[in-house]
Amino acid sequence: MAVFTAVTEPQLAEWMRHYDLGDVVEFRGISSGIENSNFFLTTTRGEYVLTIFEKLTAEQLPFYLDLMRHLAAHRVPVPDPMPREDGALFGLLQGKPAAIVTRLEGAPELAPGVEHCIEVGQMLARMHLAGRDYPAYQPNLRSLPWWKETVPTILPFLEGGQRELLSSELAYQEAFFASADYAALPEGPCHADLFRDNAMFAHAEPGTGHEVRLGGFFDFYFAGCDKWLFDVAVTVNDWCVDLATGKLDAARTEAMLRAYQTVRPFTAEENRHWGDMLRAGAYRFWVSRLYDFHLPRAAELLKPHDPGHFERILRERLSGVALPGIHTSCN
């Protein structure tokens, strides 16, 4: 179970004194988290999630919590951080930063279809546009500078083709990031980790004509300011793939990209570099999974994800993938 920091009833009662959220009805740990300790919290006022941040510091948290509050205020369905009585969005619990956010309706869809991808594509574009006037800035902390720092620590564990691919793709991405076309790509706050287990779906309302309804996006704690196309690529690389092979499913991919473009059409530069950004999205998670696999953190309680999954995806993307109706090449 992914609760790294336990909370007793007296500790919870003392913590809740700082909030105007009613009386506690139920409190239980959530098993799915890998970075933080998460708990479902039901009170007489509603349903929430309490998160104790195991790695993020009090100095780092405002960017993420304020972004979520900003998006929620712009009608993007995301967890809305609840202010304490002093107005702060987090405090210290068990000596660690902790926050309470609203609980999204629904459950993750781990086998998404075309309609799920349409919902995600449209909402991702809405989220990008809603974040344009968010005043704070923080770069994506898992982008090129982190790759350049991390790859040398991973290479000694790899052999042959893996070493060659990890090094050659880093060089390719460095050149891409330095290009004028890359500089021209639209950017702003990005989720940067919008996998299928970071979205909720609820039952659609009768008579709406929709089979599914997006409950919202969550887990914004890898968010940062980056190229919007990178966020799209990360999302497509998870929602639209065959998990066994890493190959893109054409129907889901086209559905998500067309849905996104009904809200925010891609620019010429984005069309031209779609293949490059799919590679960047795959590379980012291959690097992080290799790092977690070969250099696990002290006291890591969970089994790391298989790095081979994103190696397969990267190798698939090297052949080039087109946006709907537009032929693009990685070369």
Swiss-Prot record:
Show which residues constitute the signal peptide: none
Reading the lineage from the top rank, the first entry is Bacteria
Keyword list (alphabetical) reads: Amino-acid biosynthesis, ATP-binding, Kinase, Nucleotide-binding, Threonine biosynthesis, Transferase
* InterPro entries xrefs: Aminoglycoside_PTrfase (IPR002575), Homoserine_kinase_II (IPR005280), Kinase-like_dom_sf (IPR011009), Pseudomonas-type_ThrB (IPR050249)
| A single BP term in Gene Ontology | threonine biosynthetic process
- The UniProt record lists the EC number as 2.7.1.39
Name its pathway.
Amino-acid biosynthesis; L-threonine biosynthesis; L-threonine from L-aspartate: step 4/5
| A Pfam family it matches | APH
Q: Which GO terms describe its molecular function?
A: ATP binding; homoserine kinase activity
Catalytic activity line of the entry: L-homoserine + ATP = O-phospho-L-homoserine + ADP + H(+)
Q: What class of enzyme is it?
A: transferase
**UniProt-listed PANTHER family:** AMINOGLYCOSIDE PHOSPHOTRANSFERASE DOMAIN-CONTAINING PROTEIN (PTHR21064:SF6), AMINOGLYCOSIDE PHOSPHOTRANSFERASE DOMAIN-CONTAINING PROTEIN-RELATED (PTHR21064)
The family classification in the record reads: Belongs to the pseudomonas-type ThrB family.
Could you identify this protein by its name?
Homoserine kinase
Organism name: Paraburkholderia xenovorans (strain LB400)
